[in-house]
Amino acid sequence: PLGPSFQFGRGESVFVRYRVLGFTRSREARVHLECTLDAMDPRGIRLVETQRKTVDTELSPEDKDWAPVLLHEFVIPPLADPGRYRIAITAEDKLSGQRAQAEVFFQVRGPVVEPSDTLVARNFRFLKGEDGPVVAGPPVFQRGEMLWARFEITGYKIGENNRIEVEYGLSVLGPTGKEIYAEPVAAAERSTPFYPHHYLPGILSLNLEKAQPGEYTLVVKIRDLVGNQQYESRHRFQVR
């Protein structure tokens, strides 16, 4: 068992093992159990489909102290929210009709992305590289460098079967305010995941090899095709 302070990371596997006791044996020494496991996030939304295990066997006389041990495994979604998660286990004795239930909790660590009722980009930051570090202070880049930016998209609508259709692009305004570059669809997410994550990570890059010194504006445009929403944000940076 894990200690009370243990926290799982997103994308990690969780293994659950338990023993079932007090079940009925038929005259033929038969045992028949149906067990289920559900894993739910802090909002009560299931992470994966209900897992089912069946124990249907006949015991021999030397099995008088035998009890079934069941093992489940599931993966925490890579975009799961941090917080307290719940595992609910049910065991049903098909011979007697009795049911037993148990629950256990575990913690998941990860970044917090504030939810929104409408489409928005959160936590925009300029980076010095694809994986950081974050630009501290005014965003100033040298000509020839690669500009990177990251943000989280939330507030999009989720369609039937958890359908998500979000795309985003960029444009760059030069020192005079005129658009000098555009990439309408830099990336897109079109999926129907079982677990409806409430945000998506966004990343953009821009080659400054031909940029002249001056102040520029990076315009981020996001479109939610399921909810028919659009969002735009502007972020200034300098090239020296």
What residue spans do the PLM features occupy?
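Intrinsically disordered, low-complexity terminal regions enriched in Ser/Thr/Pro/Gly
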Residues: P1-R240
